[in-house]
Amino acid sequence: MPVTMSRRAYAGMFGPTTGDKIRLADTELLIEVERDFTIYGEEVKFGGGKVIRDGMGQSQRSRAEGAVDTLITNVVILDHTGVVKADVGLKDGRIAAIGKGGNPDIQPGVTITIGPGTEIIAGEGKILTAGGVDTHIHFIAPQQIEEALCSGVTTMLGGGSGPAEGTKATTCTSGPWHMMRMMQAAESLPMNIGFFGKGNASKPAALIEMVEAGACGLKLHEDWGTTPAAIDCCLSVCDALDVQATLHSDTLNESGFVETTIAAFKGRTIHAFHTEGAGGGHAPDIIKVVGEQNVLPSSTNPTRPFTRNTLDEHLDMLMVCHHLDPHIAEDIAFAESRIRKETIAAEDILHDLGALSMFSSDSQAMGRVGEVVIRCWQTADKMKRQRGALPEDISGNDNFRARRYIAKYTINPAIAHGISHVVGSVEPGKLADLVLWSPAFFGVKPDLVLKGGSIAYALMGDANASIPTPQPVHYRPMFASFGRSLIESSLIFVSAVSIERGVGARYGLSRPLEAVRGTRGSISKKSMILNDATPVMEVDPETYEVRADGELLTCEPADVLPMAQRYFLF
């Protein structure tokens, strides 16, 4: 017999549906459900007296007959593709289907079969996103992995070998021996990981050696000498072996200016780190590369968004990270040349225009590994407050802006580094690296973090309590963070040539290796989903004012941010 429910009652029972709006944390951003794949009156829900019971919402079908391993019920998916409500089926550690879960023997429209072997994760009233992809990691301390996971990041690409001075300043795992040791260490970490070799060399042999040893990319860093010759050599090796090149250019303009570096690219694809420049790069105008079709530009999170405290914290941070001496005038001048309020303000707007394509952390090296997601949404909120709704958001929601910003730390870095075939979005066939959020805590504190379809980290109460919720509730490792489950639930991203050369067996690795692919001529700025703008960039060398297509880009620093202190009282 049909029953009519109010929207409020329906949302309370089954979560929001088409036309309902959801506020993201304490921001001014509202997303609206565009489509609901579930069927009214046929929704499935787990619990006493609920639908998913034998002969009701649960069929008799075995796993071999098509039942999924896990079903996330009635969840709102926020992805670069849109905002939809659906059931999400997981099987073999992958996303199997997005649609309508249930018992196909008695329910209409079922596209995902629930069987006796199906586990249920309740998604009612929750938001599901893809795990974040952080492509600027200094692997200084293994404790970064826990911080990143608890923020919603499930893939980390970068370089280093621990708290050595080279690693504290540059994202490079230098040489085959360190590459081997870091890949062996990654076996015990519940995170997808890939390592960049050092890209600074004028002859190719040593660079080829590192890629053959397992590097999934090469990093050019000014502290090792990012000269035109090194850039050209590095890009040539990357083109030959299909790995991405990443750039931290010459702040001091010793070997040339930004135009010299652009010329050295010769139109070849490169990922430009901290493109604004406070994190490093040609002073004061590295931001010009935003307008180049072959440059994939990203930000690191210390300058995100521009606040009244941004400039003050950067000087000391920079001195430590780059091994500078506060008693040497030239070192002070070097540091001060990188910190400019004008370019940092412009960075906010370039993100909102979709001209800056990606977010990353720069972990412990002028960046906070657990704040990629937070800083991204804080920037989106600041831009809505200062610039209003985007032209594409004409329906009273912020769906387009939300899609643009989530793409910056999910699908776009995955595309840039040749791993979008397995991670970066909530799509069938991809690794089930998923993050479940309560809307009030969206972007700040996830409820669950899944790795390869299993729960790796979660908010969990006292383990000696009679139920899971008594205090103290904090993040704790779950079963996918232990034993063989840990090994099988995550990947190490490597070059294809290293797999051909058998590095897994040579290093004694048990974890699956996944080759990066399609990182070179097949991608460009046009590949950056919802973030592919290439404005003509100008920077005044005296005032540092930034213009895009002739328009001055400036905004005020924020005094107050959402997703901040009220969420971290304890």
UniProtKB/Swiss-Prot annotation:
GO terms for molecular function: nickel cation binding; urease activity. Binds 2 nickel ions per subunit. It catalyses: urea + 2 H2O + H(+) = hydrogencarbonate + 2 NH4(+). Ni(2+) 1 binds at residues 136, 138, 219, 362. It holds the Pfam family Urease_alpha. Pathway: Nitrogen metabolism; urea degradation; CO(2) and NH(3) from urea (urease route): step 1/1. One of its GO terms (biological process) is urea catabolic process. This is Urease subunit alpha. The gene is ureC.
